């Protein structure tokens, strides 16, 4: 299987479970000079990203206008905007930028899609997204936010034009299945509301030895990589796992890095810390989602189609008509009581 780090997955696909049946995103930041950014009202230090949906065919002016409107609606108040590259050609100031964008798409995608000239490129839908001046400060605490947003748009348009590019159709060949391992997930994630770092996976996942030695557990939590991994197929996570911490000193340091005192750690996990003192071999594993694997094998589009007693969107089991009211006697037997919220 292909192997890709979490950071590469986000920077290239905008998601931690890439669907590699479609080409990756392209970063056009180096093509936009400060002068061009100023003229186009684009933030100076934020990435400009583009992607291509293959074999959509040439769109009419009306169709393209409607598509740009749909893209802007999807982006909402994010501060991101669609750059209409077709209008750049008519301006002597921006025509070189349009040519640079076209050439970079050609360079990045020619081997993937099999076209070798800009004329063939016209059959493919090109989308370029720019951060407008004053893009929300959310960027300040999530440096990957723009990549994730553009990645979500990429998938949305891929679904919209699925009947055109046909990349999601089953051909009965090995090419239908794009497996990969995504590795090196973040050890911590930032909670903006609580202003604290939390364990992204769980606090028993082992961090990279290099990050431990560099002191990043206390000095730079956002850069700490976990020995965590997912196996992905066609944009679906089939399983997730990690290498566990097997050293007491590392486990204690992780608890401290999450704001837990040594006393609290021993009160809650003393049994585990004591066990680690006697020596534990390196160990890890993975949990596979059997229901998702069955869904793919069955060619189903939803987990509900392969689960024996699926729930509705309102969490109702239509087979047994659950949930149903519980009698007072049943509640009493279980020492439970119901509380009605105002």
Region spans (language model):
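Class II aminoacyl-tRNA synthetase catalytic cores and aaRS-like
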Residues: 1-342
């Amino acid at each position: 299987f292909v192997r890709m780090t979490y950071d590469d997955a986000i920077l290239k696909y905008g998601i931690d479970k890439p669907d590699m049946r479609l080409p990756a995103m392209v970063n056009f930041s180096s093509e936009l000079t400060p002068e061009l950014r100023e003229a186009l009202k684009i933030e100076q230090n934020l990435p400009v990203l583009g992607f291509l949906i293959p074999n959509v065919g040439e769109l009419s002016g009306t169709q393209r206008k409607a598509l740009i409107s749909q893209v802007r609606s999807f982006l909402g108040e994010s501060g991101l905007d669609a750059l209409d590259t077709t209008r750049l050609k008519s301006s002597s100031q921006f025509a070189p930028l349009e040519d640079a964008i076209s050439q970079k798409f050609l360079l990045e995608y020619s081997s993937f899609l099999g076209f070798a000239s800009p004329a063939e490129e016209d059959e493919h839908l090109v989308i370029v997204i720019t951060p407008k001046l004053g893009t929300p400060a959310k960027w300040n605490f999530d440096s990957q936010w723009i990549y994730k947003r553009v990645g979500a748009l990429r998938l949305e348009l891929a679904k919209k034009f699925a009947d055109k590019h046909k990349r999601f159709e089953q051909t009965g060949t090995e090419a239908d299945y794009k497996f990969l391992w995504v590795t090196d997930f973040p050890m911590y994630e930032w909670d903006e509301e609580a202003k604290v770092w939390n364990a992204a996976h769980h606090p028993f996942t082992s961090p990279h030895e290099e990050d431990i030695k560099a002191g990043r557990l206390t000095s730079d939590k956002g850069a700490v990589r976990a020995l965590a991994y997912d196996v992905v197929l066609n944009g679906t996570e089939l399983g997730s796992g990690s290498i566990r911490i097997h050293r007491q000193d590392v486990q204690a340091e992780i608890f401290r890095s999450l704001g837990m005192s040594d006393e609290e750690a021993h009160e809650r996990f003393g049994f585990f810390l004591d066990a680690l003192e006697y020596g534990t071999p390196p160990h890890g594993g993975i949990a596979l989602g059997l229901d998702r694997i069955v869904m793919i094998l069955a060619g189903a589009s939803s987990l509900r189609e392969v689960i024996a007693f699926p729930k509705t969107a309102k969490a109702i089991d239509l087979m047994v008509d659950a949930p149903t009211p519980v009698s007072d006697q049943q509640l009493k037997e279980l020492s439970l009581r119901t509380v009605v919220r105002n």
